[in-house]
């Protein structure tokens, strides 16, 4: 109950400002849930009672109506206990960390591809030294074809195929974890610039 405690004179409960901050935090959490795909949403510990409200919020496209539906979703979310909301927040944070790692892995593969195209056999030798299971002939042919396609302004078929081969190699042998020493190469390249 709000108001002052008669004995101590201190306020009971959260202030209005604190209540507004908490309500806005839950509203933002609802917006994040609505932005997720159905597959991503299925991985989260969202109570079944909230699913229809989330789907309805996705369906509504009119700006004001969408905002009103999000407020309605937030109202239902405030009825949930704090542990449920904390579990949803934690799962969303873990989901974003996973996505960030995947993006970083793709960037590493792209950097390897660009190094192979720019440095040629030097970069290929480093890649093969780190990953002896890689097919030297296939990689060399893809690099040669990608350079040729670039010079002739042709569609980048070999360029894409080189990316796919490097990505498969990274998933098989741990290139995504940065075991290749690529970070050292990047810092050396940045120091040269």
Swiss-Prot record:
Compositionally biased region (Basic and acidic residues): 1-10
Acidic residues bias locations: 181-193
Key words of the record: Cytoplasm, Ribosome biogenesis, RNA-binding, rRNA-binding
Family: Belongs to the DarP family.
GO cellular component terms attached to this protein's record: cytosol
Recorded name of the encoding gene: darP
Top-rank taxon, per record: Bacteria
Family annotation (SUPFAM superfamilies): PSPTO4464-like
Pfam families named among the record's database cross-references: DarP
A molecular function (GO) term: rRNA binding
rRNA-binding as UniProt keyword: yes
Localisation: Cytoplasm
Stretches the record annotates as Disordered: 1-20, 171-193
Keyword Transcription regulation: no
Matching InterPro entries: DarP (IPR006839), DarP_sf (IPR023153)
Role this protein plays: Member of a network of 50S ribosomal subunit biogenesis factors which assembles along the 30S-50S interface, preventing incorrect 23S rRNA structures from forming. Promotes peptidyl transferase center (PTC) maturation.
Annotated protein name in UniProt: Dual-action ribosomal maturation protein DarP
Biological process annotations from GO: assembly of large subunit precursor of preribosome
